[in-house]
Design a protein with these regions (language model features):
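Short, charged beta-turn/beta-strand-edge "cap" motif at the junction between a beta-strand
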Residues: 64, 102-106, 147
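Short beta-strand-centered segments at strand-helix junctions
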Residues: 1-9, 15-61, 66-94, 99, ...
Length: 147
């Protein structure tokens, strides 16, 4: 349960969790709101696509490091197993839509990229801005819509 502080040109954000998996380059995923509040112009990208992304400083208990690039707003995506993908008739890298029905804030997310991998149930990854916009909870279920 390690935490760091992300430092941008305008301010800092403390207690940011470090998550796996380990990657060859350091990566920071922020919501668009958090990136803007730090003064960072973070592009919307899939994990690992860091070329030309925003810089920042990371400060932790063992010291600090300047990242020349590595800050992104994570592109919304759907993790799904090969069996579930076959049943839903979607392919890895395909862009779909997902309809979220909630009490007060139902909406359709467009530009959701499918990421097929074993060992995962269908799980959509959105940031806190997107989750709040749709009124999502941990029990929210979405409907996959092909484009």
């Amino acid at each position: 349960n390690e935490k760091v502080t992300v430092v941008g040109p305008k301010k800092s954000q403390a207690n940011v969790s470090i998550l796996g998996p380990f990657r060859s380059k350091s990566q920071v995923e922020l919501s668009a709101t958090d990136a803007r509040s730090l003064g960072l112009n973070a592009p919307v990208r899939l994990s690992g696509d860091l070329a030309g992304s925003a810089p920042c400083k990371l400060v932790g208990p063992a010291g600090e490091v300047e990242l020349a690039e590595g800050v992104i707003v994570a592109k919304r995506h759907l993790h799904i197993s090969a069996a579930e993908a076959e049943k839903a008739n979607v392919a890895n890298g395909e862009v779909i839509m997902v309809k979220i029905t909630s009490a007060d804030r139902s909406l359709i997310f467009d530009d959701v990229e499918v990421r097929i991998g074993e060992g995962c149930d269908a799980t959509m990854h959105v940031d806190t801005d997107e989750s709040n916009a749709a009124g999502c909870t941990s029990a929210t279920v979405g409907e996959l819509i092909k484009k």
